[in-house]
């Protein structure tokens, strides 16, 4: 089997594709000096969907671009990928920042929304099909984006993250922070967690993003309890109750945790899976409605 890099070069040569990750400047409001990269496939769909992909602590936008198979799916299905990057706080997202946790107040979240708006305008993208995903700190920020800007995102997928506002009030949100209460499984009632979401955008009564939560049961950096707390939060916000567990889905090591009929909220907990849970592009993109 050809290594992935060689296979990609072979496919590029065969098809004449030349799309690549590109840095974008001057996209709009950027209160925390974050960076924007995009991957726009050569064969762009009419009114393309957008996925915002958020890297983990210590990562970068280019490293996360290389970290999943999303670019190859973008080539096949014609959607756009936005890769934000943060140079702040050991390259960790500001999930503790009151501005990021509040609709329209600033922080990383406002800069990311500005990237989305820029991309929609530039490529005539479909504003009703904007999605967000991320790993570790990016998974935490995925929950923040879905909670703080629900009108922007149709659905999200958080890998190895924590509930929205779990790090609220902490001095920082890195693996080196002295306060690791959140990452060790801070607990609230579903209603308390739900109120953190509702209070991030007071008065909002519109639809809320559908969510997937992925986590490893052997994660000793961001404890598995964090995923269960995130599921409690979104079950309250989305108004769906736990319905069943399904063993061996999407693969043998995992248990699928289904809420309601599974169309709004699903969790995946992996036995023997550490930090971070691997990205399952196919399951995620099916949930988003971007592939069959």
From Swiss-Prot:
Glycans are attached at residues 88, 117, 179, 245. It comes from the Eukaryota. It holds the Pfam family Esterase_PHB. It is found in: Secreted. It catalyses: feruloyl-polysaccharide + H2O = ferulate + polysaccharide. Keywords: Carbohydrate metabolism, Glycoprotein, Hydrolase, Polysaccharide degradation, Secreted, Serine esterase, Signal, Xylan degradation. Its EC number is 3.1.1.73. Residues 1-18 form the signal peptide. GO terms for cellular component: extracellular region. GO terms for biological process: cell wall macromolecule catabolic process; xylan catabolic process. GO terms for molecular function: feruloyl esterase activity. Involved in degradation of plant cell walls. Hydrolyzes of the feruloyl-arabinose ester bond in arabinoxylans as well as the feruloyl-galactose and feruloyl-arabinose ester bonds in pectin. Belongs to the carbohydrate esterase 1 (CE1) family. Feruloyl esterase type B subfamily. This is Feruloyl esterase B. The lineage of its organism: Eukaryota, Fungi, Dikarya, Ascomycota, Pezizomycotina.
């Amino acid at each position: 089997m050809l290594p992935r890099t060689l296979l990609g070069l072979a496919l590029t040569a065969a098809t004449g594709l030349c799309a690549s990750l590109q840095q974008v400047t001057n996209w709009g409001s950027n209160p925390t000096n974050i960076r924007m990269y995009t991957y726009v496939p050569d064969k762009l769909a009419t009114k393309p969907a957008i996925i915002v992909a958020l890297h983990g602590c210590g990562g970068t936008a280019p490293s996360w671009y290389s970290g999943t198979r999303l670019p190859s799916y973008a080539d096949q299905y014609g959607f756009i990928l936005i890769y934000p990057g943060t140079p702040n706080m050991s390259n960790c997202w500001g999930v503790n920042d009151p501005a990021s946790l509040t609709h329209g107040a600033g922080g990383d979240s406002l800069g990311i929304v500005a990237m989305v708006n820029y991309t929609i305008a530039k490529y005539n993208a479909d504003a009703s099909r904007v999605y967000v995903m991320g790993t570790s700190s990016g998974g935490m920020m995925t929950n923040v984006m879905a909670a703080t800007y629900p009108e922007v995102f149709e659905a999200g997928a958080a890998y190895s993250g924590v509930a929205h506002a779990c790090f609220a009030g902490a001095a920082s949100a890195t693996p080196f922070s002295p306060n690791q209460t959140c990452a060790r499984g801070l607990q609230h009632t579903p209603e308390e967690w739900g109120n953190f979401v509702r209070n991030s955008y007071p008065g909002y009564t519109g639809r809320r993003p559908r969510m997937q939560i992925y986590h490893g049961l052997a994660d000793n950096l961001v404890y598995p309890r964090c995923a269960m707390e995130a599921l409690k939060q979104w079950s309250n916000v989305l108004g769906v109750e736990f319905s069943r567990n399904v063993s061996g889905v999407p693969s043998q090591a995992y248990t699928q945790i289904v809420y309601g009929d599974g169309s709004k909220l699903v969790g995946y907990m992996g036995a023997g899976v550490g930090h971070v849970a691997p990205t399952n592009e196919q399951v995620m993109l099916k949930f988003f409605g971007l592939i069959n």
